């Protein structure tokens, strides 16, 4: 569960654009925010987490971005019954933004893993 909470927070807070930005091409993970959040997260929790939980924190971010992209797309295709929308293609826009974020996270996964290790050693 820790990965879900961490991943969802990063997915939402460390994206260069808002989750419903119409500019999906600008979506991506801000590694400075990722580093700062990870430092703040690990400082009080590292002692209570397993090595596997810590090692998979970056992957959890990717998983949550992928999960939300599928959920937004599914909601759009089903007529938007779950997520509140402000306009007809709102969930489609959200899905595209999350897909772009996930692609960027995948491209930066090694950097994210390195940041987690650096933050862990600084605790």
Place the predicted regions along the sequence by residue.
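General structural signal for secondary-structure boundaries
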Residues: 30, 50-51, 109, 113
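Generic alpha-helical secondary structure signal
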Residues: 28-35, 55, 89, 93-96, ...
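ATP/Mg2+ or Mg2+-diphosphate-binding catalytic cores
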Residues: 67-123
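All-alpha amphipathic helical-bundle segments outside canonical DNA-binding/catalytic cores
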Residues: 49-61
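Active-site activation/catalytic loop segments of kinase-like enzymes and analogous catalytic loops
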Residues: 3-47, 63-82
């Amino acid at each position: 569960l820790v990965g879900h909470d961490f991943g969802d927070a990063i997915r939402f807070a460390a994206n260069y654009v808002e989750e419903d930005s119409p500019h999906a091409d600008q979506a991506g993970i801000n590694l400075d925010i990722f580093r700062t959040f990870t430092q703040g997260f690990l400082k009080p929790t590292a002692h209570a987490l397993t090595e596997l939980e810590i090692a998979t924190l970056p992957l959890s971010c990717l998983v949550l971005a992928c999960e939300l992209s599928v959920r937004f797309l599914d909601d759009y295709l089903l007529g938007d019954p779950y997520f509140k929308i402000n306009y007809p293609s709102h969930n489609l826009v959200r899905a595209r933004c999350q897909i772009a974020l996930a692609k960027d996270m995948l491209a930066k996964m090694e950097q994210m893993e390195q940041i987690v290790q650096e933050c862990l050693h600084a605790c």
